[in-house]
Amino acid sequence: MVQILGGEVYSPAAGVKKMTEEMLEQRLTECGIPFSPDLPGKLLKYHELLLEWNAKMDLTAVTEETDMIDRHYVDSLMALTIPELIPQGASLIDVGTGAGFPGLPLALARADLRVTLMDAQQKRLNFLQAVLDALNVQNVTLVHARAEDGARMKEQRECYDVAVARAVAPLPVLAEYLLPYVKVGEKAVCWKGPAVQDELGAGKKAAFLLGGKLAEPIPVAIPGQEWQHLLLPIAKQTKTARQYPRKAGTPGKSPLGQTDKA
């Protein structure tokens, strides 16, 4: 519905869009995230498509607007507040990307990055392709594969400067998903909650088996939110043995570092 206010055409829908874009810009600024002037508008279009597609398929359980902005876009971009985590011009893979977090916001914020978004469900990749088309994104490639299977592809294995995941999985499982994709001398980065402290022992053992070493978790505070995430880098020190990752489903059922089975 379009209304005439003071001789000017006013669309309530346009007003809501402007408020959302302003909220995105405000939250990025409050969190100290570096961004270009066009990023809030790009994130807004992403947000609109996410809401549209979420009505017909399960992409996110978080639907309250302020919470979506913080949990999806801001949380994904908090890695940019720590410059050494994602170097200029890096190749980056987001394993199990789902609706694109954290990899797609990072790609939108950093045109210098070469980003691969990998997921096991084609319908999620169809959504992501719609976002890429709508925004004419040129620095993102989509790959349809499970984490364990993708890491056995010659063109994917140990080819990336950074591998990331925001999946809800124990640290030893994430290590087995991510480290096989990472070049020696580079890193994986896991988005984790405070409960990761209980996973560090097994996580260190798993990382060692996979050629990696855990660094100290980095707290990233999002103002006004009770929940907080930690960013946990894992340095890739040596090549990952050929038997890793194990066959699809095994890392989750029998995590490294928590069992004698390898």
Question: Where would I find each of the regions flagged by the language model?
Answer:
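Conserved SAM/SAH cofactor-binding pocket of Class I
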Residues: 77-167, 175-176
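SAM/dcSAM-binding transferase cores
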Residues: 201-262
